[in-house]
Protein backbone atom coordinates (compact mmCIF):
# COMPACT_ATOMS: atom_id res chain seq x y z
CA UNK A 1 0.00 0.00 0.00
CA UNK A 2 1.38 3.41 -0.96
CA UNK A 3 0.17 6.98 -0.64
CA UNK A 4 1.05 9.09 -3.68
CA UNK A 5 1.02 12.89 -3.82
CA UNK A 6 0.61 14.31 -7.31
CA UNK A 7 1.43 17.94 -8.06
CA UNK A 8 0.42 20.05 -11.06
CA UNK A 9 2.75 23.03 -10.66
CA UNK A 10 1.93 26.62 -11.53
CA UNK A 11 3.25 29.98 -10.37
CA UNK A 12 -0.29 31.22 -9.62
CA UNK A 13 -2.26 27.98 -9.04
CA UNK A 14 -0.66 24.69 -8.04
CA UNK A 15 -2.92 21.66 -7.98
CA UNK A 16 -2.44 18.72 -5.64
CA UNK A 17 -4.02 15.29 -5.46
CA UNK A 18 -3.47 12.47 -2.99
CA UNK A 19 -4.39 8.84 -3.61
CA UNK A 20 -3.74 5.54 -1.88
CA UNK A 21 -2.78 2.58 -4.03
CA UNK A 22 -3.39 -0.94 -2.79
CA UNK A 23 -2.62 -3.34 -5.60
CA UNK A 24 -4.85 -2.33 -8.49
CA UNK A 25 -7.24 -0.38 -6.27
CA UNK A 26 -6.92 3.42 -6.10
CA UNK A 27 -8.54 5.35 -3.27
CA UNK A 28 -9.06 9.11 -3.33
CA UNK A 29 -7.73 10.80 -0.18
CA UNK A 30 -7.89 14.48 -1.06
CA UNK A 31 -7.21 17.21 -3.59
CA UNK A 32 -7.26 20.95 -4.02
CA UNK A 33 -5.20 23.92 -5.10
CA UNK A 34 -2.60 26.20 -3.61
CA UNK A 35 -3.40 29.72 -4.79
CA UNK A 36 -0.82 32.46 -4.72
CA UNK A 37 -1.54 36.15 -4.88
CA UNK A 38 -0.25 38.48 -7.53
CA UNK A 39 2.64 39.53 -5.32
CA UNK A 40 6.26 39.15 -6.30
CA UNK A 41 7.52 35.78 -7.50
CA UNK A 42 9.66 34.95 -4.44
CA UNK A 43 6.60 35.33 -2.19
CA UNK A 44 4.57 33.09 -4.50
CA UNK A 45 7.32 30.44 -4.45
CA UNK A 46 7.38 30.56 -0.66
CA UNK A 47 3.59 30.02 -0.60
CA UNK A 48 3.93 27.00 -2.92
CA UNK A 49 6.70 25.52 -0.78
CA UNK A 50 4.75 26.05 2.44
CA UNK A 51 1.52 24.73 0.91
CA UNK A 52 3.15 21.53 -0.36
CA UNK A 53 4.88 21.13 3.00
CA UNK A 54 1.49 21.34 4.81
CA UNK A 55 -0.02 18.77 2.43
CA UNK A 56 2.89 16.39 3.06
CA UNK A 57 2.48 16.76 6.82
CA UNK A 58 -1.28 16.17 6.56
CA UNK A 59 -1.29 13.12 4.26
CA UNK A 60 2.16 11.58 4.93
CA UNK A 61 2.71 10.37 1.34
CA UNK A 62 5.26 7.71 0.44
CA UNK A 63 5.95 9.11 -3.03
CA UNK A 64 5.83 12.43 -4.84
CA UNK A 65 4.94 12.74 -8.54
CA UNK A 66 5.07 16.00 -10.48
CA UNK A 67 4.54 17.14 -14.04
CA UNK A 68 7.65 17.94 -16.07
CA UNK A 69 8.20 21.38 -17.54
CA UNK A 70 6.95 21.62 -21.10
CA UNK A 71 8.54 23.77 -23.77
CA UNK A 72 6.56 26.98 -23.87
CA UNK A 73 6.61 29.65 -26.55
CA UNK A 74 7.08 32.22 -23.80
CA UNK A 75 10.44 31.61 -22.12
CA UNK A 76 9.49 33.76 -19.12
CA UNK A 77 6.43 31.57 -18.43
CA UNK A 78 8.53 28.41 -18.69
CA UNK A 79 11.06 29.83 -16.22
CA UNK A 80 8.35 30.73 -13.70
CA UNK A 81 6.83 27.27 -14.05
CA UNK A 82 10.25 25.72 -13.49
CA UNK A 83 10.69 27.78 -10.35
CA UNK A 84 7.25 26.71 -9.06
CA UNK A 85 8.20 23.07 -9.69
CA UNK A 86 11.45 23.64 -7.83
CA UNK A 87 9.64 25.01 -4.77
CA UNK A 88 7.35 21.96 -4.68
CA UNK A 89 10.22 19.51 -5.24
CA UNK A 90 12.29 21.06 -2.44
CA UNK A 91 9.37 20.54 -0.05
CA UNK A 92 9.23 16.86 -1.07
CA UNK A 93 12.98 16.35 -0.81
CA UNK A 94 13.03 17.98 2.64
CA UNK A 95 10.69 15.16 3.73
CA UNK A 96 12.91 12.53 2.06
CA UNK A 97 10.23 11.68 -0.49
CA UNK A 98 11.33 10.13 -3.77
CA UNK A 99 10.47 12.44 -6.68
CA UNK A 100 9.08 11.11 -9.95
CA UNK A 101 8.46 13.26 -13.03
CA UNK A 102 5.99 12.70 -15.86
CA UNK A 103 5.45 14.45 -19.17
CA UNK A 104 1.99 16.01 -19.54
CA UNK A 105 1.40 14.03 -22.71
CA UNK A 106 2.09 10.74 -20.91
CA UNK A 107 -0.27 11.70 -18.07
CA UNK A 108 -3.09 12.40 -20.54
CA UNK A 109 -2.32 9.22 -22.48
CA UNK A 110 -2.40 7.15 -19.29
CA UNK A 111 -5.58 8.62 -17.83
CA UNK A 112 -7.65 9.47 -20.91
CA UNK A 113 -6.06 7.33 -23.60
CA UNK A 114 -5.22 10.34 -25.77
CA UNK A 115 -2.02 12.35 -25.32
CA UNK A 116 -3.69 15.52 -26.58
CA UNK A 117 -6.72 15.32 -24.25
CA UNK A 118 -8.11 18.58 -22.88
CA UNK A 119 -8.69 19.51 -19.24
CA UNK A 120 -12.37 18.54 -19.30
CA UNK A 121 -11.55 15.05 -20.56
CA UNK A 122 -8.95 14.67 -17.80
CA UNK A 123 -11.48 15.83 -15.18
CA UNK A 124 -14.07 13.35 -16.48
CA UNK A 125 -11.70 10.38 -16.43
CA UNK A 126 -10.22 11.21 -13.02
CA UNK A 127 -13.78 11.40 -11.67
CA UNK A 128 -14.54 7.96 -13.13
CA UNK A 129 -11.28 6.27 -12.17
CA UNK A 130 -11.51 7.42 -8.55
CA UNK A 131 -15.34 7.12 -8.44
CA UNK A 132 -15.77 10.68 -7.19
CA UNK A 133 -19.23 12.14 -6.64
CA UNK A 134 -18.25 15.41 -8.33
CA UNK A 135 -15.51 16.67 -10.62
CA UNK A 136 -12.45 18.13 -8.92
CA UNK A 137 -11.17 21.56 -9.95
CA UNK A 138 -9.16 21.46 -13.19
CA UNK A 139 -5.73 21.88 -11.57
CA UNK A 140 -6.58 19.39 -8.82
CA UNK A 141 -7.79 16.91 -11.46
CA UNK A 142 -4.48 17.29 -13.30
CA UNK A 143 -2.60 16.59 -10.06
CA UNK A 144 -4.74 13.51 -9.40
CA UNK A 145 -4.04 12.38 -12.97
CA UNK A 146 -0.30 12.67 -12.26
CA UNK A 147 -0.72 10.55 -9.12
CA UNK A 148 -2.77 7.99 -11.10
CA UNK A 149 -0.02 7.88 -13.75
CA UNK A 150 2.55 7.15 -11.07
CA UNK A 151 0.33 4.42 -9.60
CA UNK A 152 0.04 2.92 -13.09
CA UNK A 153 3.84 3.04 -13.43
CA UNK A 154 4.18 1.21 -10.12
CA UNK A 155 1.75 -1.46 -11.29
CA UNK A 156 3.79 -1.86 -14.46
CA UNK A 157 6.99 -2.17 -12.40
CA UNK A 158 5.32 -4.84 -10.26
CA UNK A 159 4.23 -6.73 -13.34
CA UNK A 160 7.68 -6.53 -14.91
CA UNK A 161 9.44 -7.74 -11.76
CA UNK A 162 6.66 -10.19 -10.84
CA UNK A 163 6.86 -9.01 -7.22
CA UNK A 164 3.66 -9.76 -5.32
CA UNK A 165 4.95 -8.19 -2.09
CA UNK A 166 5.92 -4.85 -3.62
CA UNK A 167 2.45 -3.32 -3.24
CA UNK A 168 2.76 -3.55 0.54
CA UNK A 169 6.30 -2.17 0.64
CA UNK A 170 6.60 1.29 -0.94
CA UNK A 171 10.27 1.51 0.06
CA UNK A 172 10.98 -1.64 -1.99
CA UNK A 173 9.07 -0.18 -4.93
CA UNK A 174 10.97 3.08 -4.68
CA UNK A 175 14.29 1.25 -4.60
CA UNK A 176 13.24 -0.76 -7.65
CA UNK A 177 12.25 2.33 -9.61
CA UNK A 178 15.42 4.16 -8.59
CA UNK A 179 17.49 1.23 -9.75
CA UNK A 180 15.67 1.11 -13.09
CA UNK A 181 15.60 4.84 -13.77
CA UNK A 182 18.46 7.24 -13.27
CA UNK A 183 18.72 9.36 -10.12
CA UNK A 184 15.29 8.32 -8.84
CA UNK A 185 13.53 10.23 -11.58
CA UNK A 186 11.02 8.32 -13.65
CA UNK A 187 10.92 9.88 -17.09
CA UNK A 188 8.78 8.66 -19.93
CA UNK A 189 7.95 10.79 -22.94
CA UNK A 190 5.61 10.03 -25.79
Curated annotation (Swiss-Prot):
Reaction catalysis annotation: Endonucleolytic cleavage at a junction such as a reciprocal single-stranded crossover between two homologous DNA duplexes (Holliday junction)
Keywords associated with the record: Cytoplasm, DNA damage, DNA recombination, DNA repair, DNA-binding, Endonuclease, Hydrolase, Magnesium, Metal-binding, Nuclease
Single annotated GO MF: crossover junction DNA endonuclease activity
Free-text remark on how the cofactor is bound: Binds 2 Mg(2+) ion per subunit.
Active site: 8, 67, 139
Domain of life: Bacteria
Stored CDD domains: RuvC
Major location category of this protein: cytoplasm
PANTHER family cross-referenced by the UniProt entry: CROSSOVER JUNCTION ENDODEOXYRIBONUCLEASE RUVC (PTHR30194:SF3)
Function: The RuvA-RuvB-RuvC complex processes Holliday junction (HJ) DNA during genetic recombination and DNA repair. Endonuclease that resolves HJ intermediates. Cleaves cruciform DNA by making single-stranded nicks across the HJ at symmetrical positions within the homologous arms, yielding a 5'-phosphate and a 3'-hydroxyl group; requires a central core of homology in the junction. The consensus cleavage sequence is 5'-(A/T)TT(C/G)-3'. Cleavage occurs on the 3'-side of the TT dinucleotide at the point of strand exchange.
Protein name stated in the entry: Crossover junction endodeoxyribonuclease RuvC
Species this chain originates from: Pasteurella multocida (strain Pm70)
Organism lineage: Bacteria, Pseudomonadati, Pseudomonadota, Gammaproteobacteria, Pasteurellales
Amino acid sequence: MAIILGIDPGSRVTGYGVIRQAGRHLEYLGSGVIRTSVTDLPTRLKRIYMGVNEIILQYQPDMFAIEEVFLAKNANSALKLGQARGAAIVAAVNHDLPVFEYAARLVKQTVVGIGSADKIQVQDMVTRILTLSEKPQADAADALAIAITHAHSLQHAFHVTNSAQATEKPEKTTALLKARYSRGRFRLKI
